[in-house]
Amino acid sequence: MADRDDIPDYHRTAVPASTQIPKQGEKLNILLVTRGHPFDRDGFFDIFDGNPQIQYSNVEHPAAQYMFTPEMADKFDCYVQYDMPGIKFGSDTPEYFEPPEFYKEGLRAMGEAGSPLVLLHHCAAAWPAWPEWAEIVGGQFLYTPMQSRGIDCPDSGYNID
């Protein structure tokens, strides 16, 4: 079982949002996974609040990492990810971190089980130190020049202020 030492230091001090697993019924049960970048929270959640066919829970990193198991995924119809973990922005260049091993194993097992994921926008920039993530997403956004799929690549063109 994972413990606190498996969570990167920059996530340990984070205060995650609370979540409840919705009751299964006629509505779609969606797990919204967020954190790692600023966004219009009201606008984002309004999309889901305004759809009477959806009920959702929101979980933020690092707590979200514990939700990535086939057993947990069975409680939801789909995960919608609008997260960007694995990057710590500072005064200079960003620092990159791999996810904990328990998260990697859980995500792989979800893939093998056919658990549906919807990966939005910022997910392409998540986990840059973990090459397998680019394969899962089907692409990669690079904040700095680095290798992607074994090829030296320039950054993707975003100017970090």
Name each model-derived stretch.
Residues 52-56, 78-81, 102-103, 139-143, ...:
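Short, surface-exposed linear patches
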Residues 40-46, 51, 101, 147-150, ...:
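A conserved amphipathic helix/loop scaffold
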Residues 33, 72-130:
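Short alpha-beta junction capping motif
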Residues 2-78:
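Aromatic-Pro/Gly-enriched surface loop or interdomain linker
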Residues 58-62, 84-88, 139, 145-149:
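Short, surface-exposed, polar/charged, turn-prone segments marking secondary-structure boundaries
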Residues 49, 112-115, 138:
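Sec-exported extracytoplasmic/periplasmic mature domains
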Residues 4-16, 22, 26-28, 120-161:
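An acidic, glycine-rich "communication" segment
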